[in-house]
Amino acid sequence: MGIMTSLRQGDVHRVTAETDVLVRVGLDGCGQCNVSTGVAFLDHMLHQLSSHGLLDLEITATGDTHIDDHHTNEDVGIAVGQALSQALGDRRGIHRFGHFVAPLDEALVQVVLDCSGRPHLSYGLQIPAERIGSYDSELVKEFFVAVVNNSGLTLHIRQLAGTNSHHIVEACFKAFARALRMAIEIDPRRAGAVPSSKGVLEQAGGQKS
């Protein structure tokens, strides 16, 4: 791992009996991406997250994919969420809120999020195919559950249109990337203040504010 140039950076190494996941996220990057999870479709979506969110992203993962992709998919989501939380710190000076509507051909997906420290996922994708290639469509939701619970994001995902499963999921990741980019960017008018009337936004796992 060696492409990081970001000032706000999170590094997580998660090891279990099922997986070994190393994640490095740079919030102030330019979309450099080096990802290898052993789950090809997940890699493709993580590239979308990096490219459209302008996140520098390095991920390596090994897991029990000979059984299925569930553990690797979930543990990558956990580590990505933890790395985002670490990089955001006390969330001082950020815009905090983000939203985007992304099209991909016939698919249209809206994402609205809040870097609130209060994890919540409202998931509204209706993916018609059970699998996209070899990737179980149910794992899309499981990935976002893991990210949300470990990053402290409030995340709403709405599918406005779409019939092609690949298009729906890719539009979702692109919308998430752009909404996240909007939320985590530094707001110069904040002058480094925490974007909350309470004066504090806790990291994931702390007391909610």
UniProtKB/Swiss-Prot annotation:
Catalytic activity as recorded in UniProt: D-erythro-1-(imidazol-4-yl)glycerol 3-phosphate = 3-(imidazol-4-yl)-2-oxopropyl phosphate + H2O
UniProt pathway annotation: Amino-acid biosynthesis; L-histidine biosynthesis; L-histidine from 5-phospho-alpha-D-ribose 1-diphosphate: step 6/9
Keyword terms of this UniProt record: Amino-acid biosynthesis, Cytoplasm, Histidine biosynthesis, Lyase
GO CC annotation terms, alphabetical: cytoplasm
Cell compartment(s), UniProt: Cytoplasm
Single annotated GO MF: imidazoleglycerol-phosphate dehydratase activity
InterPro entries, per the entry: IGPD_sf, ImidazoleglycerolP_deHydtase, ImidazoleglycerP_deHydtase_CS, Ribosomal_Su5_D2-typ_SF
Protein name: Imidazoleglycerol-phosphate dehydratase
Organism: Prochlorococcus marinus (strain MIT 9313)
Higher taxonomy: Bacteria, Bacillati, Cyanobacteriota, Cyanophyceae, Synechococcales
